[in-house]
Regions:
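Acidic, Ser/Thr- and proline-rich intrinsically disordered linker/docking segments
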Residues: 1-17, 22, 28-30, 36-95
């Protein structure tokens, strides 16, 4: 499973750093806060309404929850690559 180093804000607004992994039917965020609290969030592809890479951020709009914005802590171009892979897997899941 390919993983990417990212940062994001959790639902409480706290900044998290960790990784995102793409599974066959989900994207999973695992990481922690600056206070050492672990955070994990699994998003089924059916929960994701749309994906857009813009201004160096990956925007994930969810059907029934607030959108997520991810930033890269990985190599240059990794977030754009993640966006393309996620869009491709979402399209395949819908088909």
């Amino acid at each position: 499973m390919q993983t990417y180093a990212v940062y994001w804000n959790d639902p409480e607004g706290e900044r998290c750093a960790g990784r995102v992994s793409l599974g066959p039917s989900f994207a999973e965020l695992n990481g922690g806060t600056s206070q050492g609290q672990l955070r994990s969030l699994r998003l089924g592809f059916e929960e994701i309404a749309s994906v857009r890479y813009q201004h160096g951020r990956l925007h994930l709009w969810r059907r029934n929850a607030a959108p997520l914005r991810l930033g890269s802590a990985d190599r240059p171009g990794a977030l754009r690559e993640l966006a393309e892979r996620l869009k491709s897997q979402l399209a395949a899941a819908v088909a």
